[in-house]
Amino acid sequence: MTTPSPALSDLHAFLTGAPTSRPVVWVAAGRRPAPDDLPEDALVIAAEELETAPGQELLLREGELDADCEQIVVADALEISVMDYVLASYLPCTGPTLLRLAGDADWDAFLEDADDAVATGYVPDHLLSPLVLLEDAWPLASGDLPAGRCTLTADGASPCLPGAPSPLGRDTGGRPWLPRYLTLVAALRSVRTRDARDVVVSGLGARLGEHAPAELTEDARTAVILRTQDGYRCLLPDTGRFLSLPEQLALLLELVLTLGPDTETLAERTGLSPEQVRAAMSALEEAGILGQAALV
């Protein structure tokens, strides 16, 4: 039996907290909701056969995602290992793996990895593997729990994954840049599937130009600028678009994102004339880059 692709995509989104095209409901063992108790177009992930209404889809699983869960099996076909984040540095993730941030030690290890990545540019392999899913990566980057996610247990309904509250509610310890960090990591993981050679991401251990401040000050979902061996690239997180940029335009964009769009300041930092700066910013606007950054 193979797992339907749309259902697999929605399961992926359920685990990471990403938006889905339909409601996704995880039904804990022992709960037997009636079809009328579920959204009319829901994907229902359950451990046993349940009655569903037209428009609803049932996806059978083994495993409960509780504190002792080490694996879930979906549709008798897809095996997903479940691992505490703190263990990921010691145990290789050789197949589909959900990294959970349920415990204090997991959260502390996650924050330490974030500090190291922002300071040095080193991102752990387990965050760059396309096989690895980080619990609630999307809410941690966006600040919002997904509206379409629901877990039904004996205690009622919750928008969090089974087994623990969302890490979104945890103390970041004075790291307002954490959402931006997750956006940068996602961009680096995406570009590494295209080009495994050395990639430098603006904001992860380095800036691409000498005049940009080192601190992560950009909004979480603004454009991500990268330097690869093939040149400068720009990723628009909300659309997934990759664009090639000339060096001068890429470095100007980095300054706009970190310092703001003041023409005089940008001209002073770059050595360009105000007219040249305005022309370059117009080109970035026309490409949809600054529009996404909400700087115009």
Residue locations for each model-derived region?
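Acidic/polar residues at beta-strand termini and the immediately following turn/coil
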Residues: A28, R61, H126-P130, L152-T153, ...
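Acidic, low-complexity/disordered tracts enriched in E/D and polar residues
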Residues: L188-L251
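Long, charge-rich, low-complexity alpha-helical segments
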Residues: M1-V44, T97-L98, P176-S202, S244-V296
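C-terminal accessory region of radical SAM enzymes
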Residues: V118-V132, L161-G209
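Active-site and channel-lining beta-strand-loop segments
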Residues: G143, A147-G163, L235
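Short, well-structured secondary-structure segments
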Residues: L43-A46, L59
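Radical SAM enzyme [4Fe-4S]-AdoMet core and its adjacent flexible, acidic
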Residues: L50, G55, E62-P146
